């Protein structure tokens, strides 16, 4: 089953399959052959947790990690009923915090946090060491090509 099938019924709660079209334009091709793998995915920006629930249902053998600053007021304990979801309430762009996370551990790290260019640059600098060999950093919502060139 294609990844976009998992997102049906979650619109507009998750924008990954609607306004941004990340499912069709990237995620389906990237993840479809890895559905049964023991993927360890970290996503910054839990908010209400809808994408984390979907990632956990899709990667049934995987571990889904999320970091959020808690500003949405969402009770993350609701997500923790699923044994392959882990949520951390902290500032994802704070170097002291990020240095407490395991190095060379994650297959994918997605930045769906503040969407601010300075945070996106920090994301690259701080989270690259946390990737396994062959792992990928993914930044959602880059604000334009001018900001993209600032990131590289």
Give residue ranges: language-model regions.
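A short alpha-helical cap/connector motif
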Residues: 1-110, 114-152
């Amino acid at each position: 089953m294609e990844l976009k099938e998992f997102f049906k019924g979650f619109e507009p709660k998750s924008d990954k399959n609607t306004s941004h079209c990340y499912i069709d334009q990237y995620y389906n091709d990237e993840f479809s052959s890895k559905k049964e793998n023991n993927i360890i995915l970290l996503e910054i920006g839990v908010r209400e947790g809808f994408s984390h629930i979907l990632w956990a249902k899709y990667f049934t053998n995987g571990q889904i990690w999320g970091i959020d600053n808690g500003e949405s007021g969402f009770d993350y304990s609701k997500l923790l009923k699923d044994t392959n979801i882990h949520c951390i309430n902290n500032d994802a762009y704070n170097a002291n915090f990020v240095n407490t996370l395991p190095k060379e551990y994650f297959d994918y790290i997605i930045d769906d946090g503040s969407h601010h260019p300075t945070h996106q640059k920090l994301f690259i600098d701080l989270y690259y060491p946390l990737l396994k060999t062959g792992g990928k950093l993914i930044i959602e919502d880059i604000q334009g090509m001018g900001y993209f060139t600032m990131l590289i």
